[in-house]
């Protein structure tokens, strides 16, 4: 796969995992970004808002825009990190992925609290015990903002049972269906457990009544990124844009960066082992292997690709 690196220092600071990494010449705007204090960077990283300076930087890096040429793919939902719309990418036959149908983000509430305690069954070892429900990240105003701006109907939560301890409904509110589906990422995406969770997840995207759908784990990076990679590949998004969309997660947090590159390579390698000349065809092979038909793939594309 052709590799591309983001022209933001914090995004490529740990890019040593890429053997082909080349440090680019920085523009004046990028140098100004690097001069920001850590607190200022954090403010920019945390959920870049519509048409912010960061979004403009992405735009100048040939990021493909939605059909109107104006809308950034970053979305602002107060309190929620790393939120963006799949809409605006270019897919099969040059068709644009529809906006407002699939959102990816960090979780709408914190993980449940946990602590390590002595494991009575295994002397000398510790085990993690989960307790209490994770604190909500949304205010009432933020929930109202979501209803007015996104209208999410389905909250697809990819976190573990422990992370979602004591949860029974979506933090977005009673009008949203919470679907808890513990899922895998990267190389584990191709394990039997990974395939079973992906089968549950993909079925949701075949029913138009479920849309708009929000997909998240805790950070919106690994588990979310792996599922979104499959969905985008099925829609015919180019290899370059698949990689760039994964890299964009590094924008929102200084702790999510290219250190995960070897794991991402396992995801790419897993698809490369499947039948198909292109990533799109390999994604089709994966979906067929977990029990879906060509008609299902066509249905998903009809929902997600603009005419």
Regions inferred by a protein language model and the residue ranges of each:
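Cys-dependent protein tyrosine phosphatase-like superfamily
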Residues: 19-214, 226-307
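Ser/Thr-glycine-rich phosphate-binding loops at phosphate-binding pockets of nucleotides
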Residues: 219, 223-224
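Sec-dependent N-terminal signal peptides
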Residues: 4-13
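N-terminal signal peptide c-region/cleavage motif recognized by signal peptidases
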Residues: 13-19
């Amino acid at each position: 796969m052709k590799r591309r690196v983001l022209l933001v220092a914090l995004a490529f600071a740990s890019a040593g995992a890429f053997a082909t990494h080349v440090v680019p010449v920085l523009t004046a705007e990028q140098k100004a970004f690097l001069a920001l204090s850590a607190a200022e960077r954090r403010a920019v990283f945390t959920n870049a808002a519509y048409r912010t300076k960061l979004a403009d930087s992405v735009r100048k890096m040939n990021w493909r825009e939605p059909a109107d040429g104006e809308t950034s793919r970053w979305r602002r939902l107060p309190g929620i990190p790393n939120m963006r719309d799949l809409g605006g990418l270019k897919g099969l036959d040059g068709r644009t992925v529809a906006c407002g149908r699939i959102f990816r983000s960090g979780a709408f509430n914190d993980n449940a609290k946990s602590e390590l305690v002595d494991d009575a069954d295994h002397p000398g070892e510790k085990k993690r015990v989960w307790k209490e429900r994770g604190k909500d990240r949304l205010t009432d105003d933020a929930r109202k903002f979501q209803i007015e701006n996104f209208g999410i109907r389905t909250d697809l939560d990819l976190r573990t049972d422990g992370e979602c301890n004591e949860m029974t409904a979506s933090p977005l509110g009673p009008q949203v269906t919470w679907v808890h589906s513990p899922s895998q990422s990267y190389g584990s995406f191709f394990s039997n457990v990974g395939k079973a969770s992906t089968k549950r997840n993909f079925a949701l995207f075949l029913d138009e009544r479920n849309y708009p759908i929000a997909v998240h784990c805790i950070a919106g990076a690994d588990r979310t990124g792996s599922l979104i990679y499959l969905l985008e590949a099925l829609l015919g998004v180019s290899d370059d844009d698949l990689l760039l969309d994964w890299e964009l997660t590094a924008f929102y947090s200084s702790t999510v960066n290219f250190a995960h590159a070897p794991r991402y390579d396992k995801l790419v390698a897993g698809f490369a082992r499947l039948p198909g000349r292109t990533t799109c065809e390999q994604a089709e092979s994966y979906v067929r292997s977990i029990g879906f038909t060509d008609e299902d793939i066509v249905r998903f594309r009809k929902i997600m690709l603009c005419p």
